[in-house]
């Protein structure tokens, strides 16, 4: 059944050509939404993802570090579909697993800039569109916010800032009908996790694999479809009274 929140406009999935983003895009399309996805460099992958989902899916190249690029994509997506009803931020990149004392200032600055400023650019350009549609933001975050995993500060620290920005949006923009929520991910069996596991001399060796499984109540890693189902729910009318919330999808890691 098509959710009323998806009847008009589109769902813009930032990072929609990636492992989790592409599955989110597919789930939104199956829920009846018009879908637009963004990519940074790999146009072929984005084109393949779009064609696999639905010929009507539109792709846009986006550099979220460039405010003009973000503004252009927001306006083009809104023009193509009439409006934007949901922004899903599923963009991600391989972040080094380092302990705090191993991180130099240049690496720290580059990660903070990419994650925090990139998200803020999306918010700054997206809010005018979401005010018109009374739409929502869904941010793909980390369960490390609830239970810190040593060596993961470069992932968790910027997301902690973004979580407070989301709460600010929920508080300040609620009267405009805008909702803002996040999904706090545990280990999801796709994308970046696969690449990191395949690297030699990686932090993510077999011992790490077993140790993490032992911390999970459900004793398995998550599937991208489970993340996508949650994203669709949070953006739908069924979650119409939920805002400013971070929903763990982590197999019980945070317990």
Task: Map each language-model feature to its residues.
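Catalytic loop of short-chain dehydrogenase/reductase
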Residues: 92-94, 136-162, 166-175, 187-188, ...
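Conserved glycine-rich cofactor-binding loop
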Residues: 17-18
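Short, small/polar-rich loop/turn modules that mediate ligand/substrate recognition or access, typified
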Residues: 174, 179, 242-244
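Conserved NAD(P)H cofactor-binding loop of Rossmann-fold oxidoreductase domains
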Residues: 90-96, 252
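C-terminal substrate-recognition "lid" of short-chain dehydrogenase/reductases
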Residues: 81-82, 129, 220-249, 254
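Conserved glycine-rich Rossmann-like NAD(P)H-binding loop of the short-chain dehydrogenase/reductase
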Residues: 31-47
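Substrate-binding pocket helix/loop in short-chain dehydrogenase/reductase
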Residues: 98-100, 104-110, 212
């Amino acid at each position: 059944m098509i959710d009323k929140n998806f009847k008009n406009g589109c769902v813009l999935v930032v990072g929609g050509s990636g492992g989790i983003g592409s599955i989110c895009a597919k789930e939104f399309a199956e829920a009846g939404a018009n879908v637009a996805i963004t990519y940074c460099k790999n146009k072929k992958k984005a084109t393949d993802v779009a064609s696999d989902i639905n010929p009507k899916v539109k792709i846009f190249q986006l550099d979220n570090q460039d405010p003009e690029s973000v503004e252009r994509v927001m306006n083009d997506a809104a023009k193509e579909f009439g409006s934007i009803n949901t922004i899903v931020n599923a963009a991600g990149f391989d972040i080094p697993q380092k302990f705090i004392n191993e991180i130099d200032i240049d690496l720290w600055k580059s990660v903070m800039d990419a994650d925090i400023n990139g998200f803020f650019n999306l918010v700054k350009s997206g809010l005018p569109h979401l005010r018109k549609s009374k739409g929502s933001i869904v941010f793909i975050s980390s369960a490390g916010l609830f239970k810190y995993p040593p060596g993961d500060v470069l992932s968790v620290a910027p997301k902690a800032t973004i979580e407070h920005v989301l709460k600010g949006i929920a508080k300040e923009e609620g009267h405009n009908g805008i909702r803002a929520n996040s999904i706090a991910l545990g280990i999801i069996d796709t994308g970046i996790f696969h690449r990191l596991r395949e690297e030699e001399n990686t932090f993510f060796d077999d011992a790490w694999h077993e140790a993490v499984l032992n911390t999970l109540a459900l004793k398995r890693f998550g599937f991208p479809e489970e993340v996508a189902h949650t994203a669709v729910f949070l953006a739908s009318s069924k979650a119409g009274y939920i805002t400013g919330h971070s929903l763990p999808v982590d197999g019980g890691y945070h317990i």
